[in-house]
A protein has these predicted regions:
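Short pre-catalytic strand/loop immediately N-terminal to key active-site residues, enriched for Gly-Thr
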Residues: 63-77
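Glycine-centered flexibility sites
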Residues: 44-45, 77-79, 93, 118-125
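Charged C-terminal helix
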Residues: 97-150
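Glycine-rich beta-alpha junction loops
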Residues: 13, 44-48, 69-72, 103-108
Length: 150
């Protein structure tokens, strides 16, 4: 992990990797920064809105949150899809906020469509339009925190 450029842990995985108990957004940011990679994308992070979930992108200089509604009974594969979409955005040269918002919208939309069709796994082949042009509403905000000084 210290050699990685990007890490994409769930909140549970972040707690395990960092050896820290995480109860807040500030705890999440501190634990993510302690991991080492320049970008840590924490999925299933604490959200500000009720019945929502948050994807928190933590870098040495900034933190961006992307929140969307919870979808009960989410199929398997959401973390892998988030990591893949985030990597695709990096390779395309997009800025962090655009990558995060697009990745979160894609995963949220794919989950919602798959759940609607009672699928156990994400319906990637059937719902390809969500991969290319997601329409799901995701709110993004910059988190006011104390970034590390270079």
């Amino acid at each position: 992990l210290p050699l990685a450029d990007v890490a994409t842990p769930t909140l549970f995985e972040l707690q395990w990797m960092s050896g820290r108990r995480i109860d807040s957004e500030a705890d999440t940011i501190a634990a993510a920064r302690a991991l080492g990679p320049q970008r840590v994308l924490v999925t299933s992070a604490p959200a500000m809105r009720r019945n929502s979930t948050c994807n928190l992108l933590v870098t040495p200089r900034a933190t961006i949150a992307a929140e969307h509604g919870l979808v009960p009974n989410a199929p398997h594969g959401t973390g892998d899809l988030m990591a893949a979409m985030f990597t695709a955005g990096l390779l395309a040269g997009l800025d962090d906020e655009t990558i995060l918002k697009r990745s979160a919208a894609t995963v949220f939309e794919m989950v919602a469509r798959s759940v609607k069709r009672h699928a156990r796994d994400l319906l990637l082949a059937d719902e390809q339009s969500s991969l290319i042009n997601p329409m799901a509403l995701v709110s993004c905000r910059r988190v006011l925190d104390a970034p590390l000084r270079a």
